[in-house]
Amino acid sequence: MLVAALGVLLYRDYVREADEPEPLAPAAAAPTEDDARREGFERAYARGQWGRNKQGKGSSGAGSTLESTRVYRVFLQDFLAAHEIRSVVDAGCGDWEFSRAMDWTGIDYLGLDIVAPVIEANRRRYGAANVRFAVADIVRDDLPPADLLLVKDVLQHLSHADIARVLAKLPRYRHVLIVNDVQQDSLSAAYQDIPTGGYRPLDLTQPPYSLRGAKVLAYRLGTNTKLVLHLQGDGGRAGGNGR
């Protein structure tokens, strides 16, 4: 009898446990805006959205080749010397296709990019005592101090909200050089908003931004013009160079 009763109890426990639902796995966290921004740029490189290099891997695009940056590189090299630049933060350094041809002697260079594999490759190929690379989201993260902040071909891929967050960080820099595509005919652009990771020409001297920095260089590339804007002193927000 005791054995039979024990068997009944064990059976009841088994049935009760079998009837209980399995605990649900914790729901995956919804992707944040920061996640979406990183994933957008990672996809661009993975798919070769902006072009591919000689090895067939996604690259920073036609605007970053040695040939297409010849005029810009001459300008930038002269700018570094003329303004006695000793430190540079390159916000959105990309795959360093053209920057490797620059002379960074005597300059502490830090290249930042949101795509980790790009930064890892740059470290292996180009890292030196005065040339460093780090993974960073220039929209979200604080940017290190430097004599010069470079922002080349980056803001044209950001939403208006993300552009505003980057521009808010400029006042700390003595010099800022911003490069974007603008329309050839008027050096202005359509200002529709885009999701970050997309693209549109962008002239920051036009509304809604109306930055009053100096237009120090303009050169043709394909169907667009590259415009280099120099913001000085307080990031271009006062003293005749501001918004």
Residue ranges, per PLM feature:
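A short SAM/SAH-binding and catalytic strip from SAM-dependent methyltransferases
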Residues: 148-161
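A glycosyltransferase accessory/donor-loop signature
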Residues: 12
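Class I (Rossmann-like) S-adenosyl-L-methionine-dependent methyltransferase catalytic domain
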Residues: 15-89, 94-146, 161-243
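Hydrophobic membrane-insertion alpha-helices, especially the h-region
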Residues: 1-9
